[in-house]
Amino acid sequence: MSTDGKWLSRRFEFPGFGRTMAFVNAVAWIAESEGHHPDLDVGYGRCVVQWSTHAVDGLTENDFICAAKVDCLVE
């Protein structure tokens, strides 16, 4: 995971579009459950997930909680 102080970002790679979209849908479910939504950059076999809290223009505990939940999807 990388952070620049304003964003928590991780790139995930998958062996095809279907697996990528299954991951994206799981991320969406987590985001809706938490009421906290990441920026997603999706392409064939990859997805970059970026968390930030716009209200504080930076990171909060919720960003780290959501990122950890998404990490559990692939570990």
Regions found by a protein language model. Give the residues of each.
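Long, contiguous binding/interaction regions
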Residues: 1-75
